[in-house]
Amino acid sequence: MAIIAILIIGVEAVLLYFLAPIMRLAVKYSKFNRPMAFRLLKSTLFLVFVIAISCGNRSGNKNSIQTVVSQNTVNTDSIAGIQNSKLILGANRTEAYLPLLKGKKVVVVGNPSSLILKKELPNGEKTYVHLVDSLLSLDINLVKVFSPEHGFRGTADAGETVKDGKDPKTGLPVISLYGSNKKPKPEQLAGVDMLVFDIQDVGVRFYSYIATLHYVMQAAAEASIPVIVLDRPNPNGSYVDGPVMEAEHTSFLGMHAGVPLVHGMTIGEYAQMMAEEKWLKTQKDVDLTVIPMKNYDHKMQYSLPVRPSPNLPNDQAVMLYPSLGLCEGTTLNAGRGTKMQFQIIGAPFLPAEKYAFNYTPQPNFGSKNPKFKGENCNGLDLREVPRLNKVDLSFIINAYRNYEKKDAFFNTKNFTAHAGTAKLQKQIESGLSLEEIETSWQKEIQNFLNIRSKYLLYE
């Protein structure tokens, strides 16, 4: 305190020395008397100095908060001052990962969702740049791109084979990680120093981007190549629910036994869980770095800036996807072939008196050959359904009960792959109630929650 007092007196003396001529001039042509002018100037100078010290102290506090957050902590005392600040994606935290990429040969695993927020206007309008374009502009040595299902530019149908090629905008080689080449080959990783994974997931087990991440991390571990995951929000991250994957039914639609249909984790959290729980099944551990978000929590509602895949066109579709995605294993059309993908369901054989919404699927972007192409479907319009916080099986259960050809309702192999268990189809066919079915998976969900809790980066 004594040092501060001496500093204040010293600064005041210096300022008065240089400003004395100005003060004399002001007094000469002012109605204020000399003592009043002197006191006013002194008060003004003192106030300016105090404000400067105060601003400096606030800057120091801000830096300490950023340091705490960047250390990946969820200590609520540490982040209380910035909980109302805007969300910062992992991809936007260039200061955290650019030093790791300098001088390295880098491969990006990405698709159209790999966006960085460039600027936000006062009216809320946002401008984005693709991660690949951003890294190239910062002189990062990108050597190629790996792309997941739907391709790097996101134009392929679900399940459609995506061929290797060259990105027309950047000229970079694009290697498909879908179809027969789901895992990067050793020759495709030759000479690579770093892998950067940045893809928007939607938090649903049968959404294939987690499987792609699994294979990328597995190949990286075997080749001793570090992996950086740029974390993004989970739009379905506020709850954990649904049937749990059984080991005998694991596939590209669900790689890990014991995981519920909705896991409630960000892709960065899930990556850490895969690595630490030894789900990669590699002799070497993967060298994994997760760049966490700032100011995020699992209850936050996040509106995606672009569709994460061709048939999830908006937030409503993303919200309903955990419930309606199971329709892929039934005879029901879930909106493919319309602009209302995963917001409507229907089929020609549902009774019109109970399913009054009509639509006709036609080939379109994301669905070249939809179920019931060109046929009138009776169904439900779910575009106004309020936000769900669970997997709602009522849509499928009621459709099954109202479907005339019950033996043709399920595609057993596909439904089991999506559900992760053969039990769910049997439960629906045997007439169990929604509540009975939901109760049947609660014990397994609790087991998963115990594992999940070890890897959460956010509240």
Which residue ranges define each predicted feature?
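Conserved anion/nucleotide-ligand pocket segment
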Residues: 251-320
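Glycine-rich, charge-decorated loop segments at or immediately adjacent to ligand/cofactor-binding or catalytic sites
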Residues: 153-158, 229-250
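Glycine-rich oxoanion-binding loops at beta->alpha junctions
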Residues: 162-191, 204
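Conserved functional hotspot residues or short segments at active or partner-binding sites
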Residues: 341, 345-440
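Glycine/threonine-rich flexible loop motifs
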Residues: 201-213
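C-terminal motif of bacterial Sec signal peptides marking the signal peptidase cleavage site
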Residues: 53-54
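Coil residues (strongly favoring Ser/Thr
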Residues: 77-78, 134
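Glycine-rich, aromatic-lined ligand/substrate-binding cores of catalytic
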Residues: 294-372
